[in-house]
Amino acid sequence: MKNIKIVRILKHDEAIRIEHRISELYSDEFGVVYAGNHLIFNWYQRLYLSRNILISKKSKSRKGLIQMIFIIGICTVFLIIYGIWEQRCHQKRLNSIPIRVNINGIRGKSTVTRLITGVVQEAKYKTVGKTTGTSARMIYWFTDEEQPIKRRKEGPNIGEQRRVVKEAADLEAEALICECMAVQPDYQIIFQNKMIQANVGVIVNVLEDHMDVMGPTLDEVAEAFTATIPYNGHLVTIESEYLDYFKEVAEERNTKVIVADNSRISEEFLRKFDYMVFPDNASLALAVAEALGIDEETAFRGMLNAHPDPGAMRITRFADQSKPAFFVNGFAANDPSSTLRIWERVDDFGYSNLAPIVIMNCRPDRVDRTEQFARDVLPYIKAEIVIAIGETTAPITSAFEKGDIPTQEYWNLEGWSTSEIMSRMRPYLKNRIVYGVGNIHGAAEPLIDMIMEEQIGKKQAKVI
């Protein structure tokens, strides 16, 4: 073997793509069997036998080649055996948890996950909930303390679901409520069919987001979400243009469809929450309760007892103590539908009458979103002042000059620092509603931090 010399000359982008796929699918030494023996064979073929690997002339002897194939064969057999064993262990753990719910969609998944967790827990099931995203949390029935999920350097990975299932099984949980963490359609299939095998699937909504992965159209997004529809179980979703499509897929899978009914959710009930809850959020949780045979009274009580997500929407009082301004952080709701929906809730509570200031944060790498907001959002919010911050604000300026944005004043503060923006706004921050929209990253994050520093009475913050 001393004369064998192997040199990899994979093209850089190809190597990254292969290694990323292997990292995604084989994270934590899990699921080798999931990918199938074909992929394993191809991987080793690429590594040792393909045109992308050069074997020096000295190593081309028959003996060296046989030794190499033998080692590859041993490693492959070991990985397959380990993968099968791990798969069986994982399946045994899943089978020990009778209620498994998978929540998918674009907006509001975390809130719906928490509401459902609260409902099932209130019904006296030993319940474990899991939210994903930047504030991923584990929620347990036996304590009010939530456990932040610590992720490795590679970031979120569907392989972490194995650890979640193991922990839930070790705790002898009776219900596992999980927010789907997969975005790519293939991974959504793996998440449902291998990782959680939910018997209740929830599709919160179908909106434009991650179109580079799930798109290019909403039809493809809806198709991707069909991975959430279980076999021989329940699908819970809302009224939408894709409802009939989801029903067809559910029928093929012998799954019962329950359509969330917003008429069962009163405004009085929604006002009891100390954070923003949309009617859809609550009606979806109520529909899951129906699927699980949980009575309505228990379901409503469980929703109210559910803990809010760290990123839950609130109206924050800040600036002047006697005549405060009220801040609504909608920067992260980066699509027109969600942004306008939040504003509708603000209007329901009467805040839209407080001489609104709308702050539009623009990014140079999201010009298409800036143009979309100039066309589909800002014309429909009656603001007294519209402020453009960040970079590449030209689409907003152009829309204002054309008369498309109905506002008394327009401030183009492109490139201004956070302190300069606050100084410019400060004389106007009395008895006003301030609504941030567009993009969370860039100029918005430090502005939010500065506003939070001026928050008046954290416990007195009004919620929507």
Swiss-Prot record:
GO terms for biological process: capsule polysaccharide biosynthetic process. Induction: Capsule synthesis is transcriptionally regulated by AtxA, AcpA and AcpB. Keywords: Capsule biogenesis/degradation, Cell membrane, Membrane, Plasmid, Transmembrane, Transmembrane helix, Virulence. Its main location: membrane. Pathway: Capsule biogenesis; capsule polysaccharide biosynthesis. The chain crosses the membrane at residues 65-85. One of its GO terms (cellular component) is plasma membrane. It comes from the Bacteria. GO terms for molecular function: acid-amino acid ligase activity; ATP binding. It is a single-pass membrane protein. It is found in: Cell membrane. Essential for the synthesis of the polyglutamate capsule of B.anthracis which is one of the principal virulence factors during anthrax infection. May form a polyglutamyl synthetase complex together with proteins CapA and CapC. PANTHER family: PGA SYNTHASE CAPB, UDP-N-ACETYLMURAMATE--L-ALANINE LIGASE-RELATED. This is Capsule biosynthesis protein CapB. It comes from Bacillus anthracis. The gene is capB.
